[in-house]
Amino acid sequence: WGSASAFADYKVMFINALLMTLLSPRILAKATVAYLIFDSLHLLFEGRPSVLTGIPQWTIALSFTLFLFILDDFARYWLHRWLHAIPLLWSFHKVHHSASALNPFTVFRTHPAEAILFSVRSALVQGISTAVFFFFFGNQVTLVMVLGASIFTFAFNLLGSNLRHSPVSISYWHPIELILMSPAQHHIHHSTAEEHIDRNF
C-alpha cells in the first residue's frame, strides 16, 4: 500500500479518472451501439418475431443477465490477449505490467489508450446485447441485480475477482479454475518468470 509501485498506481488512477471524465462523452456510447443494432435488426427483419412471446419475464431477465456476462467476459478475454500479442497494444498494456508489487489499485494502472479500448469494448458488448434482447423481447428485458451489479458479476467478484491484483493469493478448486480465474492464477499472469509470460489471460 505504501510502496513506490502503489503510489504510481494511485497517480495513474487519478490521471486516468480525469482523462476519462473529459473523454467519456466523446467515446462510443452503448446507447449509440444499441440504437444502430436495433435499427439494423428492423431493416433485416420485417417486424419483431412473434415466436418469442409468452416466455416468463424472469426467464428473459436471467437469460439477458447471463448472456451479457458471458459476452462481456469473452470480449474482455480476447482484448486482453490482443493487448499481449499485438506490439502496438502491448506498448499500452505494459504500463499495467510495470507494477513491481500488486495491490487492489493495480487494476487501475493502465495507459489511457487501454482505458479507451476497454470503454469501447464495453459499449459494444452492452449495446449489442441490449439491442438483440430488446428486439426479440421488447420491454420485458431487465437485469437481475444484487446491490447495483449483475447477479453474475456480483458472484464473480464475491469469489475473489476483486482480489486479482492484491497480494492475497487465493486459489479455487481446480475444476472451478478451468472456468473462472482465481487471484492466484492472475498472480502468475503478472509474474516475470519466463515460463509465466503471456499465460493465464
Residue ranges and their predicted role:
Residues W1-D9, T32-L52:
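Membrane-helix interface linkers and caps
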